[in-house]
Amino acid sequence: MLRINRISNLRTFGQRFFSTEQQDVVVIGGGPGGYVAGIKAGQLGMKVTVVEKRGKLGGTCLNVGCIPSKALLNASHLYEEATTKMSKYGVKCSGVELDLGAMMQYKDKSVSGLTSGIEGLFKKNKVKYDKGFGKITGPNTVEVTLNDGSVKTIETKNIVIATGSEVTSLPNVNIDEESIISSTGALALKSVPKKLIVIGGGVIGLELGSVWSRLGSETTVVEFTNRIAAGADGEVAKKFQKSLEKQHMKFHLETKVTSVVKKSDGKVTVTVEQVGAGGFTGTLEADAVLVSVGRRPNTSGLGLESVGIPTDKAGRVEVGDHFNTKVPSIFAIGDAIRGPMLAHKAEEEGIAIIEQIHNGGGHVNYGAIPSIIYTHPEVAWVGKTEEELQKEGIQYNIGRFPFVANSRAKTNDDVEGFVKFLAAKDSDRVLGAHIMGTNAGELIGECVLAMEYGASCEDIARTCHGHPTLSEAVKEAAMDAYDKPIHM
């Protein structure tokens, strides 16, 4: 028996420290960039392993970001419709109550179905999946500490860093995910806070603030700059804020948070001070505070220093035009590198880097990456804003069309917002597109396609669009940029 135990222990020791594999590509990170890279590599016949420490594929986006937030945005919107609007359509809703537990179950089911779907795609495309933490130990080696505690080394021709990002907080603000929460905590609250303060007026803060506002929270957004929705066109941002204010969300712009203190009763006091003409100085009380001030790359502990790969002050891996680091066999994509922290940007990079490794191809047009805020109304944009064009001295024409003049929007009783095109004055080529309104996130796709292929506003306007559809507003806005719209 003693001899058998010794043999067993030696075998375990060997598996723990000396297990090696040979691969063409190892992808560290199983989020949108990483899992897409893994699938693409499998499709191209490469031997590929994706290493993900979470134990679930999909990264922040699928597990505690894009997907669960959209589920709650949808559910909370339906709840608000049932309590405020359905009767005008002849649908009488009596005794409407919020079952937050059931809503959270719906959210969780949406997530679990998609994570298991990715695992199915891995099997279909022969992608190996290691649940554990990957660390670079050489130009062609990755040490994986598996979640069961065992350790193995993978030898590979190429390494792709796709480790994503994590929530960042304010100095001296401790996120406990109870009263002081990050986006992760805001997706899993056990009850609706009577008062909610959102620190940060960006995409995440506005979306999650909107969810809890619809469900009954008195929601206040505190933003350091003089506008919400950074990156959006200025005209759109102003009208968007007014829309959210009509939905009873409050805003303190040009206001700095100086302290966040949790009291013994669990409530939170937020002290703020004015940093601009429109700012506010004082204290705010809340049952919950959502800290939504940005994210930082997940690059610490990867072993980058051991192979001489530098990062910038924000922790982003420094790469060249083809995602290449200073080590020829190591690449980086997604939130780990420069650029907007967007899942779809990472997905495009995931495909591009594998094509680059495979045959030297692979390209991402960063001038045609859309941004979307999934509130109601939605806000979406691609390309240049007016402010950017003015700063660059580029002359342009503007085309606008309001949804109030769109027949489908009228029949849907949802006419808030507009479509706006910015087109080059000399060529009519689309330079930017900005939409505020229902399904803006779906409508922006046509505009992205137009920019990808260098289309003009006239090209869009002379393309037949179905009637009645919201997409006709895109056509009419394009028509307004070079001529005159028909229905306005």
UniProtKB/Swiss-Prot annotation:
Keyword Glycoprotein recorded: no
Family the entry assigns: Belongs to the class-I pyridine nucleotide-disulfide oxidoreductase family.
Gene3D superfamilies (UniProt xref): 3.30.390.30, FAD/NAD(P)-binding domain
Primary residence: mitochondrion
Record: residues binding NAD(+): 200-207, 223, 257, 294
GO BP terms in the entry: 2-oxoglutarate metabolic process; glycine catabolic process; isoleucine catabolic process; L-leucine catabolic process; L-serine biosynthetic process; pyruvate metabolic process; valine catabolic process
Cofactor(s) required for function per UniProt: FAD
Name of the protein: Dihydrolipoyl dehydrogenase, mitochondrial
Pfam families noted in UniProt: Pyr_redox_2, Pyr_redox_dim
Superkingdom of origin organism: Eukaryota
Catalytic activity: N(6)-[(R)-dihydrolipoyl]-L-lysyl-[protein] + NAD(+) = N(6)-[(R)-lipoyl]-L-lysyl-[protein] + NADH + H(+)
Keywords: Disulfide bond, FAD, Flavoprotein, Mitochondrion, NAD, Oxidoreductase, Redox-active center, Transit peptide
Active site: 467
Disulfide cysteine pairs (residue numbers): 61-66
Gene for this chain: lpd
UniProt-listed InterPro entries: Class-I_Pyr_Nuc-Dis_Oxidored, FAD/NAD-bd_sf, FAD/NAD-binding_dom, FAD/NAD-linked_Rdtase_dimer_sf, Lipoamide_DH, Pyr_nuc-diS_OxRdtase, Pyr_nucl-diS_OxRdtase_dimer, Pyr_OxRdtase_I_AS
Additional notes on this entry: The active site is a redox-active disulfide bond.
Residues of the transit peptide: 1-25
UniProt EC number: 1.8.1.4
Top-level enzyme category: oxidoreductase
Cofactor note: Binds 1 FAD per subunit.
Residues reported to bind FAD: 52-61, 70, 134, 163-165, 335, 341-344
GO function term, MF aspect, one: dihydrolipoyl dehydrogenase (NADH) activity
Keyword Methyltransferase found: no
Subcellular localization(s) per the UniProt record: Mitochondrion matrix
GO CC annotation: extracellular matrix; mitochondrial matrix; mitochondrion; oxoglutarate dehydrogenase complex; phagocytic vesicle; pyruvate dehydrogenase complex
